[in-house]
From Swiss-Prot:
Function: One of the primary rRNA binding proteins, it binds specifically to the 5'-end of 16S ribosomal RNA.
InterPro entries on file: NA-bd_OB-fold, Ribosomal_uS17, Ribosomal_uS17_bact/chlr, Ribosomal_uS17_CS
CDD domains: Ribosomal_uS17
Protein name in UniProt: Small ribosomal subunit protein uS17
Subunit structure: Part of the 30S ribosomal subunit.
GO BP annotations, alphabetical order: translation
Sequence similarity: Belongs to the universal ribosomal protein uS17 family.
UniProt KW Ribonucleoprotein keyword: yes
Keyword field: Ribonucleoprotein, Ribosomal protein, RNA-binding, rRNA-binding
An annotated GO cellular component: cytosolic small ribosomal subunit
Gene Ontology molecular functions: rRNA binding; structural constituent of ribosome
Length: 84
């Protein structure tokens, strides 16, 4: 059986922890009554083994086994570095 590995793309909003980052995933959802599309944000904690991510970087993460109480995602690659 091959399972589909979930991958997400988002922006790093915190890199202050050692070997960990917080990634904000933005999605658009339709309001059930008014029909207007609203921007919703999900924050995910991800494992960054080499501490290579910086604040504002666009990264790709994938789901993995639980690494801590809140961390179940790991960094795949950095799509775009933030402008310094």
């Amino acid at each position: 059986m091959s399972e589909k590995i979930r991958t997400m793309q988002g922006r790093v909003i915190s890199d202050k922890m050692d070997k960990s980052i917080v990634v904000a995933i933005e999605r658009m959802v339709k309001h059930p009554i008014y029909g207007k599309y609203i921007k919703r944000t999900t924050k995910l904690h991800a494992h960054d083994e080499n501490n290579e991510c910086g604040l504002g970087d666009t990264v790709e993460i994938r789901e993995c086994r639980p690494l801590s109480k809140t961390k179940s995602w790991t960094l795949v690659n950095i799509v775009e570095k933030a402008k310094a």
